[in-house]
């Protein structure tokens, strides 16, 4: 989040609230409502409580609500817990209007809007911080855990989708699966077994945290993963309709 925006509004650090078990969806909504405003009096909202990518928002809200969409052989999209997540997103964009209107013409602009200094909360990561040079911004970037949803709790609050990344599979019935495996292994073994070479540049993300406090938050969140394949199923999810109010969670 943008520390200066919260400080100017007299709002407490969400990390302190999280430590006390008070950083919840309701509290986050309260913050976003307070921080969405017309700052120059021209009648146009120019400060928003939130903006980021919708897929990151879906992932993190479901995990913080103690649930997933596609984490087993049973469909969970229609569950009460996921519905709570979709309702929260719908309300952010169409009821409270605390989220900057979704820009369907420029996907990356939704992730990077915070760079202008008028977004209170956004979804950050080491690679985003590195690409956008967060350390060089004229405001302080503070990382905090996700607020806990109404169906979640501290124990079930997850922050990392462990199914992200590339996975290679060998279908059942393939001739000589061991040969196929060895080909893939050699293809990926660009470091020729030298793990120091493979892992030598993995400290770059420590610098992306900017502060020791942010690094501690990142380390904590990185240890709490959930498994959800919903965004890798090749299905056509009409999320824009939810964001622009054409469709409700129930629909």
Model-derived regions, located:
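Acidic, glycine-anchored loop motifs typical of Ca2+
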Residues: 38-46, 154
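Extracytoplasmic/periplasmic substrate-recognition and gating elements
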Residues: 134-206
């Amino acid at each position: 989040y943008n520390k200066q925006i919260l400080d100017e509004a007299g709002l407490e650090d969400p990390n302190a609230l999280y430590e006390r078990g008070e950083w919840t969806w309701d509290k986050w909504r309260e913050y976003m409502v307070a921080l969405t405003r017309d700052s120059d009096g021209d009648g146009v909202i120019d400060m928003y409580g939130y903006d980021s990518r919708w897929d990151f928002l879906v992932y993190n809200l479901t995990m913080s609500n103690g649930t997933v969409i596609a984490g087993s052989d049973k469909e969970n999209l229609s569950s009460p817990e996921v519905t709570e997540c979709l309702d929260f997103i719908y309300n952010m964009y169409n009821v409270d209007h605390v989220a900057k209107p979704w820009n369907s013409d420029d996907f990356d602009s939704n992730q990077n809007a915070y760079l202008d200094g008028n977004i209170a909360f956004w979804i950050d990561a080491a690679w985003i911080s590195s690409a956008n040079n967060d350390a060089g911004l004229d405001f302080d970037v503070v990382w905090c855990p996700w607020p806990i949803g109404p169906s979640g709790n501290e124990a079930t609050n997850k922050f990392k989708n462990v199914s992200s990344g590339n996975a290679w599979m060998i279908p059942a019935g393939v001739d000589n699966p061991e040969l196929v495996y060895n080909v893939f292994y050699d293809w990926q073994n660009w470091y020729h077994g030298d793990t120091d070479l493979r892992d030598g540049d993995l400290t770059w993300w420590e610098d992306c945290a900017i502060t020791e406090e942010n690094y501690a938050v990142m380390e904590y969140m990185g240890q709490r993963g959930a498994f959800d394949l919903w965004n890798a199923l090749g299905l056509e999810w009409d999320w824009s309709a939810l964001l622009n109010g054409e469709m409700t969670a129930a629909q």
